[in-house]
């Protein structure tokens, strides 16, 4: 890969991870490098052969362009992301093209009375008649207690997910199984919780 930088620009070409996600578990905004949170053996997230251009107009805002070409043009991914900070929250807005779909989304990260509050959502508009539209959204709350206990609660909605999942759906959660961002998880409604304590 190659990279060029100046005071307000970074341009990188080659294998890289373009990380547009905010949440810990599910990242609807991450259209370039989706991953499986439950693949515990995979230590490093995958990358894309892509062009990434970042522009920093000021210390609160970032504008990004990403393009990952594919051998079949229709399977390429391209997008534009704008990040800013307002009211002590980080916000982002994106629009792009994902494998024969147009997509638009938003994300945020902040806190409510000391409780971390994050979220992401994307909508997909098919360009082919046989394609399906879809909305995916995830939100999460996390908190670190004064005695060292960390707790997190996260919810995901996937419009293309199974409302009544069977064994086949669970099989797609195994190692090396990565869902795309349009159909991010096998189920329509998913709740995830975890807790950790530092000894």
Which positions does each model-derived feature cover?
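Structural signature of outer-membrane beta-barrel domains
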Residues: 14, 18-20, 70-72, 98-100, ...
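Transmembrane beta-strand segments that form the barrel wall of outer-membrane beta-barrel proteins
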Residues: 35-37, 61-71, 78-99, 104-106, ...
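Residues that define the transmembrane beta-barrel architecture of outer-membrane proteins
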Residues: 5, 45-49, 74-78, 85-87, ...
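Outer membrane beta-barrel
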Residues: 1-62
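Outer-membrane beta-barrel channels and translocator barrels
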Residues: 6-9, 18, 58-60, 86-89, ...
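Glycine-rich phosphate-binding "P-loop"
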Residues: 41-44, 62-78, 179-189
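Generic domain-boundary/flexible-linker signal
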Residues: 22-24, 64, 130, 164
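Detector for outer-membrane/organellar transmembrane beta-barrel domains
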Residues: 109-199
């Amino acid at each position: 890969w190659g990279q060029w930088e100046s005071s307000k620009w970074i341009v990188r070409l080659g294998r890289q991870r373009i990380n547009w996600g905010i949440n810990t578990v599910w990242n609807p905004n991450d259209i370039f490098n989706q991953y499986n949170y439950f693949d515990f053996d995979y230590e490093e997230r995958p990358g894309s052969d892509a062009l990434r251009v970042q522009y920093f107009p000021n210390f609160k805002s970032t504008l990004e362009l990403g393009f990952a070409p594919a051998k079949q043009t229709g399977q390429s991914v391209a997008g534009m992301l704008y990040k800013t900070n307002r009211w002590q929250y980080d916000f982002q807005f994106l629009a792009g093209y994902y494998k024969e779909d147009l997509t638009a989304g938003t994300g945020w990260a902040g806190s409510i009375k000391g409780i971390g509050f994050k979220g992401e959502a994307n909508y997909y508009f098919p360009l082919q008649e046989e394609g399906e539209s879809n909305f995916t959204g995830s939100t999460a709350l996390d908190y670190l207690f004064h005695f060292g206990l960390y707790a997190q609660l996260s919810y995901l909605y996937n419009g293309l997910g199974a409302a009544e999942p069977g064994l086949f759906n669970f099989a797609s959660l195994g190692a090396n199984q990565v869902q795309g961002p349009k159909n991010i998880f096998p189920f329509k409604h998913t709740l995830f919780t975890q807790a950790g304590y530092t000894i």
